[in-house]
């Protein structure tokens, strides 16, 4: 309730109203005032910043809302909103192209698992485009966290500040690790979606299909990793790509690569 006092001289009136919306609880499938809810106590709902706390993430999971049959719904990690201003694809698989569209359809689909009948039963709030644009303007103020060892223009390591293993990791990142083919500096993403075809390694599983490239800026602060949180640590994430892309990195290569990513 103190957002106005904290930000009234820092944000524009439009951004302040967007922040108000991001902090306002709205009914959701599991958290609402009806008897059909998951929580023991009835509530007005949840806010955007309940999961994206301070514009970052609490690392909570949910199931994607738009897959049918429902047993094929997959787990999704809550991503950080840091650096959202510089991202052109929103939603791991839905490929929404604006923050405004994502903010609107998050309420209409994800909040009620894509079931419009449940939505109206439990109190869906229909946001107009003015409200949505205010929310988007506030979200577009969220910047990447500081990275003191990176050159502010190129996004590459400053060799005067970086350690030897961090510099070796950078060389692997842009070389045999093939990381930069998708994670392009200075934002370390390419605004595209890619299919790793992990079904090659599974039996009777359809795989994930195309998943958007997530930024690696500030990656050390937002475990677990990958779109569904299957990698608990950066080390796990490096090993995942080492196996899927058949990179054959050595143990030292992987340590150096993690050291580099911790500076992003």
Predicted regions span which residues?
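Periplasmic c-type cytochrome electron-transfer domains
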Residues: 1-264
């Amino acid at each position: 309730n103190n957002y106005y006092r904290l930000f009234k001289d820092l944000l524009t009136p439009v951004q302040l109203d967007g922040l108000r919306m991001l902090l306002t609880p709205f009914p959701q499938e599991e958290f609402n005032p009806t008897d059909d809810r998951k929580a023991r106590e009835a509530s007005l709902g949840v806010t955007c910043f309940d999961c994206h706390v301070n514009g970052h993430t609490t690392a909570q999971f949910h199931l994607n809302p738009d897959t049918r049959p429902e047993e094929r719904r997959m787990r999704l990690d809550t991503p950080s909103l840091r650096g959202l201003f510089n991202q052109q694809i929103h939603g791991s698989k839905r490929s929404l192209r604006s923050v405004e569209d994502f903010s609107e359809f998050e309420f209409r689909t994800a909040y009620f698992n894509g079931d419009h009948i449940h939505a109206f039963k439990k109190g869906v709030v229909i946001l107009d485009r003015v409200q949505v644009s205010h929310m988007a303007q506030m979200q577009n103020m969220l910047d990447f966290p500081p990275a003191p060892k990176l050159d502010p223009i190129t996004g590459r390591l400053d060799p005067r500040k970086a350690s030897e293993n961090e510099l070796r990791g950078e060389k692997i990142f842009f070389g045999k690790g093939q990381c930069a083919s998708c994670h392009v500096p200075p934002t370390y993403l390419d605004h595209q979606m890619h299919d790793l075809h992990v079904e090659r390694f599974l039996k009777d599983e359809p795989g994930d299909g195309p998943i958007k490239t997530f930024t690696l800026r500030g990656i050390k602060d937002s475990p677990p990793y990958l779109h569904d949180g299957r990698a608990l640590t950066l080390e796990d994430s490096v090993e995942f790509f080492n196996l899927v892309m058949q990179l054959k990195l050595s143990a030292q290569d992987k340590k150096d690569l993690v050291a580099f990513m911790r500076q992003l």
